Each structure stands twice: as C-alpha cells, then as structure tokens.
C-alpha cells in the first residue's frame, strides 16, 4: 500500500506543477491539428493542451479530466501531428486506467517478480499498440517520418516518468 500511496502522491504533485507552471497552447495551427485528430478519433470531451518545461516527453495526465502535456520546444507540423495522435490514442483507449490497475496489482503483489515484469511488458505493449494505430494505413515514408519523430522525442527527453501517465 505504501507503493501505491507514494505513486499517487508523486502523480498529484506532478499534475499540480503542470497546472500551475504550464501554459495553455494557443497557437492556431497546433490547436487546429489537435481538434482535427480529436474528431478523427471521435474524442468529444475537452482535453487541455499544455506546454510544460518540466515534462521529459509528451504525456497524458488525468483520469476524469485528462490533460495532454507537451515539453517546451519547437515541433514541425508532422512531429506535432504524430505526437498529438499518439497521445490521443492513449486517451481514446483509456490507457491511464490500465496503468492504474497495473500499479495497484504491483502494490498488492510487490513480492512477485512476475508482476513487475508483467507491468513493464504491458506498458511497452501499450506504447507499441499506439504506434501501430498511429501508422495504420500509412505508407513507408509516413512510417519513416513517425520513427524519426519517436527518435527525436526520445533524444530530447530521457527523464523520469510518472507511473500514472501515458507517453
């Protein structure tokens, strides 16, 4: 239970920092692209798009009121499209709820190394599944551009991740 409590406290503190120190993205092109992808994925609820200097990589935070967080920086139109679509696929699939479930199981069965492996594998599968959805029906050039975006994002931010976020 201490494990679960610790991660919830870390998550709440981080989300508070994002909401306090982040800034709402107001660039028209970025917001238009964001809304277009939301429509494409049939996501109806409001999701704030926030730029936060403390973010190591793009992520979704929140269970009931998700927030899409972008690290500060310049993104090309293609990079932004891929990043936003990847994160919104996480929202559409409810991956943050799965992560909460895995964290809870991990906290209860902390002594079982198979549970730790399962959590890590499940998180990796979630990411790969999102990657597959983003590139579904895309040509080789588009897949290459997406891969370059992933590598660029990885290169920019290799920080500590928050257990109760997607990214």
Name each region found by the language model.
Residues 1-167:
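Hydrophobic topogenic segments
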């Amino acid at each position: 239970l201490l494990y679960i409590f610790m991660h919830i406290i870390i998550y709440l503190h981080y989300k508070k920092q994002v909401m306090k120190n982040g800034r709402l993205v107001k660039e028209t092109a970025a917001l238009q692209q964001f809304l277009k992808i939301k429509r494409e994925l049939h996501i109806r609820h409001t999701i704030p798009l926030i730029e936060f200097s403390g973010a190591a990589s793009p992520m979704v935070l929140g269970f009931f009121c998700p927030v899409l967080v972008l690290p500060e920086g310049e993104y090309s139109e293609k990079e932004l499209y891929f990043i936003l679509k990847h994160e919104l696929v996480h929202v559409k699939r409810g991956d943050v709820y799965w992560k909460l479930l895995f964290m809870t199981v991990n906290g209860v069965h902390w002594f079982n190394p198979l549970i730790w492996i399962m959590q890590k594998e499940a998180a990796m599968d979630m990411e790969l599944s999102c990657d597959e959805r983003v590139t579904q029906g895309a040509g080789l050039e588009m897949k290459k551009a997406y891969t370059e975006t992933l590598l660029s994002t990885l290169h920019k931010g290799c920080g500590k991740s928050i257990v109760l976020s997607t990214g």
